[in-house]
Amino acid sequence: MVKKRQADSRDHDCSTDSGNEDLHHRKGLGSPGQSDGATPTTASCQHIKKAVDAARLRRLLKSTGLLYECSQCQKLGKTAGSAAGAGASEGAVGPGGNPVTFEFDNTLWLCLKCGSQLCGRARHKHALEHYQTPHSDSHALAMNTRSFDIWCYECDMKICSNLRKNLLECVELVKKLAQKPPTSTVTPSTPTISYIEEKLKAALEHLTPIVPMTGGSFDDSSSRGSLAAAGGGGGVGSSRNRQVAIPMPPPEPSSGLSTSDSLTSVPGMAKRIDQYSATTNGNTGNKRLLTLETPRIENERLPRVRGLTNLGNTCFFNAVMQCLAQTPFLLSVLKELSEPGEEFILPGGTFTIKDKGDIELPMIKGTLSSWGGLTAALANALEELQAGGSVFTPRKLFDRLCVKCPQFTGGDQHDAHELLRQLLESVRNEDLKRYQRVILQNLGYKDQDVNSVSEEMRQKCKIYGNQAGDRILRPEQVFRGFLVSTLTCQDCHNVSSRHEYFLDMSLPVAVEKPQPPQRRKPSPELSLTSSSSSVTPSTGQPTINTKFTDGSVNFTASSPSFFLHAHEAASLGPSKSQVKKEKERQRKAKRAAKKRQKSSLNLNGNDSGNGNELAESVDQDDASLASLGAGDGQANDGLEQTNGQTEDSTTSSVTTSEHSDADVEDNLVEDTAAPSTNNVPSSTASLTAPSKTYMDSNGNAQPPGEKRDDTPEHMDKDSLEEDENDSGIATSPAPTATNSSTSTSATGNNNSVAGSGLSGSSGALEDPLAPASLVTAGLSEKGASVIRQVSVGAEQGASNGTEDADGEAKAIEQPEKTPSQAQAMAQAQARTKRVRTQSYSDWSTTIAPRYQCEDGECSVQSCLNNFTAVELMTGQNKVGCDSCTQRINGSDPKAKSVNTNATKQLLVSSPPAVLILHLKRFQLGPRCIFRKLTRPVSYPNLLDIAAFCGSKVKNLPNIDRKQKKLLYALYGVVEHSGGMYGGHYTAYVKVRPKVAPGDKRWKFLPHGSKAELDQDDDQLKKLEELLAKEKAREQHLKVLDDSDDFSNSSSNSSTSDESQTPATPLEEQQTQQAQQPQQPQQLEEAANVRAPPGKWYYVSDSRVQEVSEDTALKAQAYLLFYERIY
């Protein structure tokens, strides 16, 4: 027997139609919208045998079919409009506390005995009255003609259709009839004159906000009053010859009342009077009233959201369709596929085929056919939803989707994100098949047998198919974006990038990015007993295992213990020698901490007098750092007792987290600071590197992984100091030429330090006054250059001379300069030495500063920040490095790939026109139990993703080169309420005006293929030159030969060891003239961007209610739909 799962008492928000019979007598067991998983059902019902007549039902339904309206309601003259008014007058309250004004669907209940189809309790309870009417037989069972639920009035419970065979036959019969269009029982009567007059009056009242009327009111009484006033009480003849008098405008509102108060009166008449007064009053009042009235009229012209019929637990489908119906560009793009005859070209090229060598594939030109069945059904459904009206039944689209994705059949609950992905992928595959037909026809594959095709032909088909798949197909233009994955090897520092497209981004719901498990660092008092102590069962005496888990310090050769922490009840105390050594270690740790703090504050290096003393102190500090970084405080003893280990305490015990200059675009190469820093050993840079926080300009403690200003983010911005010391993995990139020359120019007393810094990549050390060190201390590159100038002047003024590594004395010019003058000189020198280079590392920088997360923040921005953070790939996640493989194994093609530690980072390389964010709320918890994360995640109305986009995004044609923001506006939210095994999907959508054909937002749609992002450096340079020429032509400026970027060099910069091309003063002057008027204009344009106006609606299947924007921003979001507006 299979053990039944106990229903969760919290999971009640399942999806059924809004007209269910279980609205009555729920006895506290759930809400009216429960489904099979949570609605109380009975295992057996004794009324099934007497209350079901399948044969009679089949005969009746064959002639009448399923009805659309209740026959009793039609006889009594109760229409759907009166029902909706009655429902609204009952005082139902929806989200946000607003009264519910939704549309009732026409769900009917079919009596399984006589076949009558009547309305349920949600409307006029005719089905219940039919049961309560005395009959000679039982009429206790009724079936919902939309959701196919069966209800027993006698048991007051929901009945499972699988209990009896006759019940199952009835359900199958009704399901077949439900695919046909419903019929009406009563033919509409001939329209009367009064009915026509009421329709005309309603239409004219609806048009009054658009066309101001000058003939008075449509009310008969008001018309007669106007005639009497005009005729002075005259008779009929006078009323015929005289026109209707125009009513006097109302008095202007007092100064205490706002204009919005005067405009929010009775709909129709009040607006007509306001518009009339706007045309008769002064010019100032005209402009003000018309300006305020225009957006209100535009919003009122927007169609109301159309509800969707629940086809049986299809709330997941309905919620997604409501958001897709409000998606811009989608319907227009899909309609372009309806007409056949579109031409395309596949480039072909030279490719290597197995056992055939290199072959040349010709270019293919072809003509595409029209769209497929699923694409046509989707376009039809979207058009119906955008047109507005009553409840729409998307049966055709859902059936088409179920044919391609059978998992959605059966009426079970499914995931809304899964449905969205399957729907978009199915539409994409249909479009791709149009290309595949042309490819097969060109290769002569159409008339051949599949099994008889050669391997060469299969390879050709695959190559052409991949070229077609790399194209941005028509349905993907709306949602498709690109992510770039950048891998940096920690051994050879080789950087590689790979682009991959996405239709939506799945973000984990977490405050911080999950890091590898770290060992808890014990306090110094417990470090002596940090080895696991246990009591042997035989002797009862405690035994001590002094093997530590840091990987380098082994006190004894005993087996490693499972426990990493000491027991508090350890009875064995430390010896005197151990206490003495512990005190000595504490003193060394305090001295090292003081020296680190002192060296980080004294950036000008005035206290570096004697090289021998400094090297000695550095050795001691490194040893103390190693003792602290080992994790257990026992490093010194380990250094004395390790067998067969020789290590240099200066180089290999400490891993620096220096920042390289290779990951920026326009780097400032400063040569003036080098002479003044030669007498400062480069190993002192490691003292300032492992700081966990820094103080920004506002005095806030920030982690070193986040950016402070407009400078680009560094590759190792996570800076896992604890993991570095534990694993011995260096996170610093390879030293550049500047760092190497600084290390070799150190004094003779520190030759061993400089040599060790050059020998190993993990021990690469840099100058404390180098740009990366100053940036690590919390300064921007501009501020770092100013401090370098000031420190150089101060040091030179104190010593009156500095000796180079070669012993040459250099003359010193020491004019007094203010910080502003020093900054201006640094900028002038930077402009003359700016050079544009291209490298993979440009993808590791962002076009805007990194987002600063607050403590405990859980928002979409924090989720994106964690998604784009640098990951350390180590242990089981090591990455195969081609450079290391070639260096170690040579050019042997059969050599095994060498796996190394690496860092990985994901950034957006091409932003989509419509961004879909999926919050991963359903996760696998402890003990392999699925759970739902109900933690609130805040999301803004305007989202800026510039902090998560790579700097090469500026090369795209739909992004301005000086753009610092990429703004998206929210227009759709899919919310899930309930638990893991039972819930309900609803949607919040914003109805907005359609995008005009000439709107600039059309350029946000991508064109081309993925290969455009994977161009070689030469192709990229050519592309940049073309872009630079185009912009220079618009600005009437000359073209710079090196195709330099006109943006500020403090944002994204990079260094290069290649020859540098200095810019002429004339070019610099032209660049400044081009920058000055445009930079404020660009910022002002970004600040004035607003979300498109519109109305927010809450939609739950067929239930539609207008809500405020604040209500939509407080939902428990599962899917977020954003449209790009800037």
UniProtKB/Swiss-Prot annotation:
Residues 586-598 have a biased composition (Basic residues). One of its GO terms (biological process) is protein deubiquitination. Zn(2+) 3 binds at residues 111, 114, 130, 139. Residues 1-44, 215-264, 513-547, 570-762, 795-833, 1037-1089 are annotated as: Disordered. The keyword Hydrolase applies. Pfam families: UCH, zf-UBP. PROSITE patterns: USP_1 (PS00972), USP_2 (PS00973), USP_3 (PS50235), ZF_UBP (PS50271). Its EC number is 3.4.19.12. Residues 215-229, 254-264, 524-539, 599-614, 646-657, 730-762, 821-830, 1046-1086 have a biased composition (Low complexity). Disruption phenotype: RNAi-mediated knockdown in third instar larvae results in a significant reduction in survival in response to UV radiation. InterPro entries: Papain-like_cys_pep_sf (IPR038765), Peptidase_C19 (IPR050164), Peptidase_C19_UCH (IPR001394), USP_CS (IPR018200), USP_dom (IPR028889), Znf_RING/FYVE/PHD (IPR013083), Znf_UBP (IPR001607). Residues 32-44, 674-701 have a biased composition (Polar residues). Zn(2+) 2 binds at residues 70, 73, 119, 126. It catalyses: Thiol-dependent hydrolysis of ester, thioester, amide, peptide and isopeptide bonds formed by the C-terminal Gly of ubiquitin (a 76-residue protein attached to proteins as an intracellular targeting signal). One of its GO terms (cellular component) is cytosol. Keywords: Hydrolase, Metal-binding, Phosphoprotein, Protease, Zinc, Zinc-finger. A zinc finger (UBP-type) spans 43-181. Zn(2+) 1 binds at residues 45, 47, 152, 155. Residues 1-15, 705-718, 807-816 have a biased composition (Basic and acidic residues). Involved in the regulation of DNA damage repair. Belongs to the peptidase C19 family. This is Ubiquitin carboxyl-terminal hydrolase 16/45. It comes from Drosophila melanogaster (Fruit fly). The lineage of its organism: Eukaryota, Metazoa, Ecdysozoa, Arthropoda, Hexapoda. The gene is Usp16-45.
